[in-house]
């Protein structure tokens, strides 16, 4: 049945990369960008970036193709505390091919569960990814 929702597996190498990323000791912003390998029907690592702001990260994301991002962000709270939340960002741009959109949407929950993340956000255009947007989203989790 070609119309059924395709849920992709998570590449075992990516699982290990996500595990290491979760327990990283560095205190800078960092990101893992992931994509769906359509032929293998698997979510795979596309890139790993260090010392990257939200504004720089958005330049790394394609404007017309979906991507998954796990972003470690140095968050300075209003009271001066510093935390390093891991954020899952699903970049799902308007204008993507419907079958590609479905493949990513169908795989999102499995990837979130695999990465054990609770801060899950979605953007419909890469322009939305700014530090202001991220802080607004994170303020909900105080």
Swiss-Prot record:
Family annotation (InterPro entries): ADF-H, ADF-H/Gelsolin-like_dom_sf, GMF
Occurrences of domain ADF-H (ranges): 4-139
GO molecular function: actin binding; Arp2/3 complex binding; growth factor activity
Superkingdom of the organism of origin: Eukaryota
Keywords: Acetylation, Growth factor
Gene Ontology biological-process entries: actin filament debranching; negative regulation of Arp2/3 complex-mediated actin nucleation
List of residues that carry N-acetylserine: 2
Family the UniProt entry places it in: Belongs to the actin-binding proteins ADF family. GMF subfamily.
UniProt protein name: Glia maturation factor gamma
Organism lineage string: Eukaryota, Metazoa, Chordata, Craniata, Vertebrata
């Amino acid at each position: 049945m070609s119309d059924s929702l395709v849920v992709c597996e998570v590449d075992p190498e990516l699982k290990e990369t996500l595990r290491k990323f979760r327990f990283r000791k560095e205190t800078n912003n960092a990101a893992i960008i992931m994509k769906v390998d359509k032929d293998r029907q698997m979510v795979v690592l596309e890139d790993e970036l260090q010392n990257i702001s939200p504004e720089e990260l958005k330049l790394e994301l394609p404007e017309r193709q979906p991507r998954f991002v796990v972003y470690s962000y140095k968050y300075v709270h209003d009271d001066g505390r510093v935390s390093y939340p891991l954020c899952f960002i699903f970049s799902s741009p308007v204008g993507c091919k419907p079958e590609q959109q479905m493949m990513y949407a169908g795989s999102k929950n499995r990837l979130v569960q695999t990465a054990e993340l609770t801060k899950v956000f979605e953007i419909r255009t890469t322009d939305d990814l700014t530090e202001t947007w991220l802080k607004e989203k994170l303020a909900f989790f105080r």
